[in-house]
Amino acid sequence: MQFSFVSLLAALGFFATVRGDLHQLIVGTFGTESLYTLEFDDAALTLDLIGNSTASAASSWIALSHDKKNLYGTSYSTAPAFVSYTLGNATDILYNSTLDIGGNCSSAKAIFVTAATEPPYAVYGTLFGGTSAGCGSVYSVDENGALSELIQNYTYKSTSGVHGVALDSTNSFIYSADDSANTLWTHKVDNTTGELTLVGSVSGPVTGADPRHLTVHPEGQYLYVVLEGANELAQYSIDQSTGIPYFENVTYPLIPSNATSADYWSDEVALSFSNNYIWATSRARSTNNTGYISAFSVASNGKIVSQLFLEPTTSSGGAANASVFRSVAPSEFSDKYVALTDSATGFVEIWSLASNGSAASVVAHVDIDDGGCCANAVVRFDSTPLYLFYESTG
């Protein structure tokens, strides 16, 4: 989920001109067959709902193709499958296809999808829940980027439930966060077919750590993992010869030190536009508590330098059930903005990083209380700059 920030202030006598851009986000849902389009104005700091497109299925996670011309989603409310759409303008979302996952995991739900940024632009999906979620799938795409064929169905282990995956910047390796089996998996990517070969796996740092989501620094030396059960962000180093991550006992809290860990479950992690910061979130299991959002400074090689802050969010982020989710994603052209989605009450917020990085605060908010929103969001469109005029005294 990403935003750009470009602003220009010019004195024109008693008036000033602000040059801002409009950015459109697409937001998925858990329980309604809709894809919402939002528009963020980075000058006026407003966030508006501008489109509601009928979807073929609710999508708990959506991802863009490398060129942003296609959207891929989980088919969350049906038998495990993945869907694809062609994207036109900001609100023109055209359904293409639905492909089942195959294998022996029919009782689970499709939970996560991501797309390669290098040829052959394969799409990867994983499952969660049910009695058998230890399957993953690889899909080819056609010349237009739509899902074409299931080309590989692979397995983790019988107790697995992989809630998130991440490709490295060269698309050489894909890492899987196995929440149910407390394991991190490493697969090698075939750069001709996109198919995967298992390289190895490592257990979570402690029993009940439960890795949920993860991301890889572009330099390829470090992997960042949200530990849902431990409510921590863990930094892993990556073996440069094998690609396998190894834990060096570096973790940071995603809840306050006086909080009861059992009352929370941590969720999301993402790098900022410049890769100088990491954003991460936690959720409360009760609406009586808030969740938290945190940011970290990062060295040029990817090593975490320090935790900058831990701020309470405006809601719990969700109660303890499978249909609750919180997503955080950074902007594409600035470290300043991050989008936070919330399904506990159904909203999307834009948070702004303080100029010195010491805090963050909400600058825009939109409610979408449809009983299923909001899952994650992606940024598809950047429009022509918008010029706003306001009275100036200096």
Outline where the language-model segments fall.
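Short loop/turn segments immediately following the C-termini of beta-strands
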Residues: F30, S75-T78, T126-T131, V141, ...
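Fungal secretory targeting signals
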Residues: M1-L22
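Loop-centered beta-sheet repeat module
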Residues: F173-A234
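An edge-strand/N-cap motif at the start of beta-rich repeat modules
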Residues: G20-L47
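Blade-edge beta-strand/turn elements of extracellular beta-propeller
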Residues: L45-I50, D92-D100, A146-T155, N191-V206, ...
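Beta-rich, blade/repeat-based domains predominating
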Residues: A55-D67, G102-Y121, T155-N171, G204-Y222, ...
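Short loop/turn segments immediately following beta-strands, especially the blade-tip
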Residues: T37-L45, S84-I93, V138-L147, H187-E195, ...
